């Protein structure tokens, strides 16, 4: 068969991002997948974005990746999350038409140069002298390549669970990968067993929406893609709805806990902390009288609704009782029952920050096989693995994004340095520099890199540079124009020799209020938004940078005075659990524990100072 520069195993979100990046970088690429049904599939929540994750998709786009364009082209609803808070946590979330999303990618694959799609199962890796040379398919055909990127998602020896019923299959009834786990073990890789799950799907026409809380989208023009945006008109967007569990729901779950695959002992894999099953919520948060559930559409073409926040591994008969105890779903028709899925992943500490294996040269890993969760996290890793394949092919140094450069850098540093014990999810709290890692400035942080490596098209980069020029011109005007020079502003409480940039820092003042006096005509809302954020939050960003410098000097502070970390205020349950288990000797050791961030370290330091002074 034809020899390729790169083979990508798996056509999920990591694999697609990797394959499009390598082929766009002029590397002959083979994309191998078990089943065409799995291309770009969204087996769980059909959405892209959310806190931290939406910023990651913006970062992917800034580097020249494809996920943002796909999401914009197939969205059913767009929202800006956390808009009432500071810009460090603003994020875009899109409800995606999962049928259109897959169709979009399949069409792009057909049109993509340097990319061949192969429907087959990889049964072995060709490795000589610790260098990967290609793959062997299950029909014994050999495909040679200089590099291999493994992006098998949740399919390695995957098993689905509904109560005591276990099925040897992949997500949504697809085929699973039966051979690669054993191949990796023989090569010396340590594997971990993880678990995730997905809720039931309900027939839309059987739902009573009367008493549900309506969750519409936004009429603002927002998109993931910086310079190729596709906007979904407000009147074409589909609404989501919110309902809540009740005591009847909780009682059904409590009475049947032993039938749950997870609580009945059928599942050994560790599930995601930040996306727990409904059983987990009832057990771990027993004091809560109700839990929120999102009722969300899956496609313009499907009459199915997704119950976000209601995943379970209960048997079918129990699921029916649980679902019909929910308001509006009393007489619903269940189209597909929930399930949990177990799968193999590698310990990601066996990877370099480039995502290349430490054990086998030219072998890269990306996505959920690295112990992460989420479409956005997967796509970001696929992109970075592809970029570093290209860098190595050109005999250049790998591109490793810093924690202060991108959420992508935070994630990769976390998983390769600290490893994972549960499916890793990106959170804004994991980033020490989150005021600098904003939704609005992904282009400032990463477009130069995307352009220099050859992924970002020159015309896109030129447009970015033109926008940057306008931003700097407006900032210069604000810095050099005094209040006294504007007749309408002479009677403000600011001194007339104060500059407009100081006036703009007032919370009640908007940049649009001042631009009417500006000789530079700016109409692009993206430019206006970026200038306003830079000015209004300049002080916060400088303070955060200073705090980070101080926190780096805390390494010699001992922790033997803390018996139980529940005593420490304002740290998460995850942090408490891990600190109580590991019992770090000092703050330096505590800071290296997965899930413990610099905010937690600051809270611990404050607590130690307080008990010392008491």
Swiss-Prot record:
Gene Ontology BP, a term: tRNA wobble uridine modification
Gene Ontology MF: a single term: flavin adenine dinucleotide binding
GO cellular-component term (any): cytosol
PROSITE patterns the UniProt entry points to: GIDA_1 (PS01280), GIDA_2 (PS01281)
Disulfide links within the chain: none
Cofactor: FAD
Keywords: Cytoplasm, FAD, Flavoprotein, NAD, tRNA processing
SMART domains for this protein: GIDA_assoc_3
Binding residue positions for NAD(+): 271-285
Alphabetical list of Pfam families matching this protein: GIDA, GIDA_C_1st, SAM_GIDA_C
Binding site for FAD: 10-15
InterPro entries assigned to the protein according to its UniProt record, in alphabetical order: FAD/NAD-bd_sf, GIDA_C_N, MnmG, MnmG-rel, MnmG-rel_CS, MnmG_C, MnmG_C_subdom, MnmG_C_subdom_sf
Entry's localization field: Cytoplasm
PANTHER family to which the protein is assigned, alphabetical: GLUCOSE INHIBITED DIVISION PROTEIN A, PROTEIN MTO1 HOMOLOG, MITOCHONDRIAL
Known role: NAD-binding protein involved in the addition of a carboxymethylaminomethyl (cmnm) group at the wobble position (U34) of certain tRNAs, forming tRNA-cmnm(5)s(2)U34.
Quaternary data: Homodimer. Heterotetramer of two MnmE and two MnmG subunits.
NCBIfam families the UniProt entry points to: mnmG_gidA
HAMAP family given in the database record: MnmG_GidA
Family of this protein: Belongs to the MnmG family.
Protein name: tRNA uridine 5-carboxymethylaminomethyl modification enzyme MnmG
Organism: Ureaplasma urealyticum serovar 10 (strain ATCC 33699 / Western)
Gene that this polypeptide is encoded by: mnmG
């Amino acid at each position: 068969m034809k020899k390729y520069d790169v083979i990508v195993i798996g056509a999920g979100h990591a694999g697609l991002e990797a394959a499009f990046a390598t082929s766009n970088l002029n590397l002959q690429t083979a994309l191998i997948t078990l089943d065409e049904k799995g291309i770009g599939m969204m087996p769980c929540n059909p959405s892209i974005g959310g806190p931290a994750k939406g910023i990651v998709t913006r970062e992917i786009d800034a580097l020249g990746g494809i996920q943002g364009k796909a999401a914009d082209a197939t969205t059913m609803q767009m929202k800006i999350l956390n808009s009432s808070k500071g810009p460090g946590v603003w994020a875009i979330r899109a409800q995606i038409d999962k049928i259109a999303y897959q169709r979009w990618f399949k069409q792009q694959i057909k049109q993509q140069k340097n990319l061949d799609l192969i429907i087959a199962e990889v049964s072995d890796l060709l490795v000589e002298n610790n260098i990967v040379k290609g793959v062997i398919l299950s029909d014994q055909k050999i495909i040679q390549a200089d590099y291999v990127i493994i992006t098998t998602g949740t399919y390695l020896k995957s098993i689905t669970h509904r109560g005591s019923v276990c099925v040897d299959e992949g997500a949504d009834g697809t085929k699973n990968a039966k051979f690669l786990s054993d191949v990796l073990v023989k090569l010396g890789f340590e594997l971990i067993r993880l678990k995730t799950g997905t809720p039931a799907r309900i027939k839309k026409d059987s739902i009573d929406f009367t008493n549900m809380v309506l969750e519409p989208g936004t009429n603002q023009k927002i998109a993931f893609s910086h310079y190729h945006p596709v906007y979904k008109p407000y009147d074409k967007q589909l609404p989501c709805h919110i309902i809540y569990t009740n005591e009847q729901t909780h009682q059904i779950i409590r009475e049947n806990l032993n039938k749950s695959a997870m609580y009945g002992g059928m599942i050994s894999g560790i599930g995601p902390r930040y996306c727990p099953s409904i059983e987990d919520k009832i057990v771990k948060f027993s004091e809560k009288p109700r839990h929120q559930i999102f009722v969300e559409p899956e496609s313009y073409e499907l009459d199915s609704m997704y119950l976000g926040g209601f995943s379970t591994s209960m048997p079918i008969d129990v699921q029916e009782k649980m679902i019909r105890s929910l308001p509006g779903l009393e007489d619903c028709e269940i189209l597909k029952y929930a399930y949990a899925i177990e799968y193999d992943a590698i310990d990601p500490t066996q990877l370099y920050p480039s995502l290349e294996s430490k054990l086998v040269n030219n072998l890269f890993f990306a996505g959920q096989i690295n112990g992460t969760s989420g479409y956005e996290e997967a796509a970001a890793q696929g992109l970075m693995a592809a970029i570093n394949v290209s860098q190595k092919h050109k005999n250049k140094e790998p591109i490793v994004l810093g924690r202060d450069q991108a959420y992508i850098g935070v994630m990769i540093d976390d998983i390769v340095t600290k490893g994972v014990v549960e499916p890793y999810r990106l959170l804004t709290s994991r980033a020490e520099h989150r005021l600098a890692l904003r939704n609005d400035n992904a282009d400032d942080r990463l477009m130069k890199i995307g352009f220099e490596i050859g992924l970002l098209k020159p015309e896109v980069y030129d447009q970015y540079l033109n926008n940057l020029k306008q931003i700097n011109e407006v900032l210069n005007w604000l810095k050099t124009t005094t209040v006294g020079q504007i007749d309408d502003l002479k009677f403000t409480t600011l001194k007339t020799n104060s500059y407009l940039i100081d006036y703009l820092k007032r919370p009640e003042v908007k940049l649009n209020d001042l631009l009417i006096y500006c000789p530079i005509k700016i109409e692009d809302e993206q430019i206006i938004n970026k200038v306003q954020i830079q000015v209004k939050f300049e002080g916060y960003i400088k303070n955060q940078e200073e705090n980070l410098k101080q926190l780096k000097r805390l390494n010699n502070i001992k922790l033997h005075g803390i018996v139980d970390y529940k005593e420490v205020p304002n740290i998460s349950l995850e942090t408490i659990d891990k600190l109580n288990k590991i019992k770090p000797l000092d703050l330096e050791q505590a800071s290296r524990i997965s899930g413990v961030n610099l905010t937690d370290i600051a809270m611990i330091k404050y607590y130690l100072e307080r008990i010392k002074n008491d």
